[in-house]
Amino acid sequence: MISSNDFRTGTTIELDGAVWRVVEFLHVKPGKGSAFVRTKLKAVQSGNVVEKTFRAGEMLPQAILEKATLQHTYMEGEDYVFMDMGTYEETRLSAKQIGESRKYLKEGMEVNVVSWNDKPLEVELPNSVVLEIKETDPGVKGDTATGGTKPAILETGAQVMVPLFLSIGEKIKVDTRNDTYLGRENS
């Protein structure tokens, strides 16, 4: 059990048979009446976001999530197959469960798979990944790092804005949290 006073961004709770993650919270103490906590919750399974208000100090069941590092091995139809490299046990997740993470997911990549009650819920990518540029306008001599940007499509199909001097075939580091270019990858 967790008190609503202890909510932090990222805290997970069980509510109505589902797992919810606290996205935003605000402790409110009005001049008249009792204090309360206004929250914005995101359903881990579906991604739905709701606003909910709890009394200050209200006790709620905390969802205990388990994380396992698994390797993305292959796709079978619409399912992504992950393998525990220690036990060789396979875990399957649907494209819906993967969500936006699929635009950076490539075979052989190690990710954290989050489970609740032995059911996989979602995939947590590393903060940055190295991917190859597959499509972009050609780089022209004289383009500088301080100049503008252009769109580039990466090997996984993700699109990010990159500096003008980059060209097809180069490997770049991308931040998976906000889809931004971090730099060239020397390999």
Swiss-Prot record:
Keyword Cytoplasm attributed: yes
Record key words, sorted: Cytoplasm, Elongation factor, Protein biosynthesis
Function: Involved in peptide bond synthesis. Stimulates efficient translation and peptide-bond synthesis on native or reconstituted 70S ribosomes in vitro. Probably functions indirectly by altering the affinity of the ribosome for aminoacyl-tRNA, thus increasing their reactivity as acceptors for peptidyl transferase.
Pfam families: EFP, EFP_N, Elong-fact-P_C
NCBIfam families: efp, PRK00529.1
Entry protein name: Elongation factor P
Molecular function, one GO term: translation elongation factor activity
Pathway entry: Protein biosynthesis; polypeptide chain elongation
Coiled coil: none
Family the UniProt entry places it in: Belongs to the elongation factor P family.
SUPFAM superfamilies named among the record's database cross-references: Nucleic acid-binding proteins, Translation proteins SH3-like domain
HAMAP family with a match to the protein in the record: EF_P
GO biological process, one term: peptide biosynthetic process
GO cellular component, one term: cytoplasm
Compartment(s): Cytoplasm
